[in-house]
């Protein structure tokens, strides 16, 4: 008996659906993809992370020569990650940490196993110690669709302009979207940058789904808090990454607010004891304390949760960061660029009228969330606030040059104006007496 006319079409659709669970038509692939680097916080090291669709060994082959054999080997581990979407797609996330790297030396590497290898990538090992001048690309809110900053970031990376990337929350829009296929597409998109530079992150609100599981699984940050909060040293700076999202998604546990706050205070105390060696303290968190955008986001409220804490009094971060003399606070979330005057409790504390950022008496805030995503740019309120110094409603990203222990150079690159520098400022602070704002 012949099957009904619709039988074969239904069968084919079911077959395609089942194959799609692994992310591609055909047999699941053992070839590495979504390759990216991170700095594990240990001098002379670098972590390589990648994805396969079947379990394989986790190995990195590396060396100094761009062609020919790669004589050095490092092994690691993989963990299966099951996305929380309806298809329960399974990815295998591999991590290998390379150690005893020569500072400032360029390495060539590939990752994978006998079942399949990635192409060759290059990276330059971070220099050790405090006496060098790191250059970073800084941005947030970069999506798989409308990723305006990516082509220029790729060119910058190929030209060796940066030592690391700081992605200040909100990835892909969203990593979990379409049963995490959008996350896969995004990780492939950033590979030309992230496979060559340590790509350091913090979580944003768009990572929240399934308790931030895609963010925690896909990125490999230092520490033992699943990349939600951690710190690391880079040249003359101590960089602290933290989660603003613990203040908003309380159903995952109010205890996380307290845990992070206590960790932050402990880390800031240690950073201040080490201030002679690492004079700059820089923080990165997704949702800003302040902004002058024309929306109803938390940063537009006088008693914002990030600034003042839960119920306006519990675990607020502005007093904490001011107490321990944080120099520079990096934010995103608003799809625009805004630089504030040195500020504390809505009061401007410029160093002087002529040189406001020389020995400022309050932290400097930079909001850089215009790298490009499907939600487009965020407009500003018609009238700037008294504490707002520069506002740019254009796609772009920030360049941060930590020149030495006293000087930081900040520039905003406009993709709308073909790479034009639309903001340029130096922050200057003395080597001594850095903890307290006077």
Curated annotation (Swiss-Prot):
Query: Which Pfam families would you find in this protein's record?
Result: Metallophos (PF00149), Metallophos_C (PF14008), Pur_ac_phosph_N (PF16656)
Can you say where in the cell this protein is located? Secreted
What catalytic reaction does the record list?
Answer: a phosphate monoester + H2O = an alcohol + phosphate
Instruction: List keywords of the entry alphabetically.
Output: Glycoprotein, Hydrolase, Iron, Metal-binding, Secreted, Signal, Zinc
**Glycosylation, residue list:** 211, 350, 404
Q: Which cofactor does it need?
A: Fe cation; Zn(2+)
Question: Could you tell me the EC number(s) of this protein?
Answer: 3.1.3.2
InterPro entries, sorted: Calcineurin-like_PHP_ApaH (IPR004843), Metallo-depent_PP-like (IPR029052), MPP_PAP (IPR041792), Purple_acid_Pase-like_N (IPR008963), Purple_acid_Pase_N (IPR015914), Purple_acid_PPase_C_dom (IPR025733)
Provide the binding site for Fe cation: 141, 170, 173, 335
- Give me the Gene Ontology terms describing cellular component: extracellular region
Protein name, entry field: Acid phosphatase type 7
The family database entries (CDD domains) matched by this protein are listed as:
MPP_PAPs (cd00839)
The entry sums up its family as follows: Belongs to the metallophosphoesterase superfamily. Purple acid phosphatase family.
Q: What is the cofactor note? A: Binds 1 Fe cation per subunit. Binds 1 zinc ion per subunit.
**Species name:** Homo sapiens
Which one of the record's GO molecular function terms can you name?
acid phosphatase activity
Residues noted as binding Zn(2+) in the record, renumbered to the chain: 170, 205, 286, 333
Q: Which residues form the signal peptide?
A: 1-26
